Amino acid sequence: RLLPVLHKLDIPIVYYISPQLWAWRAGRLKTLKKYVSKMLVIFPFEEAIYADAGVPVEFVGHPLIDLAVATRSRGETCRAAGLDPDRPVVALLPGSRPNELRLLLPTLVESAMRVAREVPGVQFLVARAPALDDELFASLQVLQTAGLTMAVLDGKTDDVLEAADVVITASGTATVQTALHHRPMVIVYRVSPVT
């Protein structure tokens, strides 16, 4: 709705981080071509899509690439969290939004309990987004009361990923972070029943 208004006012429009039209609505290309002065894309394959459609485009890279750096080694992170670096570590990344956490945390807890039954000595390391409150994490106590070894690190996702052997993560930015750390992952996503 805003694009036509800005275009009519002759205001140049630079669009940073392309809509995922390659996965959803390819028809949006016509709208973007009509109104956008330049697309700044973060994935290399997007550049060709826009160029082929005649949309001015520049590949600028993904903002996480330079940021995905752990501040501690696996051993340092495990020791700081009270875990044994010589035992398997599964990272749990439940997401950063309260609603996402409410929908996914029960599934992550159930998954962790299943993994623990199959993998002797496994430990769980949870990356917690700093803005999330304690009440939302209360269900994680189930893991500790079930005798599982678990620790939570606030705002240290890259350290958690560096320490992990495998990751169970919410779909989204964390999947890109996990890939940048070259960790195998299981991606979870749950939609509302209305969807």
Residue ranges and their predicted role:
Residues 14, 40, 58, 125, ...:
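Hydrophobic/aromatic beta-strand patches that form the interior of the parallel beta-sheet core
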Residues 154-195:
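A donor-sugar binding/catalytic signature common to diverse glycosyltransferases
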Residues 37, 88, 165:
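Conserved acidic residues
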Residues 137-155:
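Nucleotide-activated donor-binding/catalytic signature segment of Leloir-type glycosyltransferases, i.e.
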Residues 97-127:
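Conserved catalytic-core segment of nucleotide-activated headgroup transferases in glycan assembly
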Residues 1-78, 93-101, 121, 129-131, ...:
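Active-site and donor-binding regions of nucleotide-sugar-utilizing enzymes
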Residues 84-91, 122-123:
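Charged active-site motifs of nucleotide-sugar-dependent glycosyltransferases
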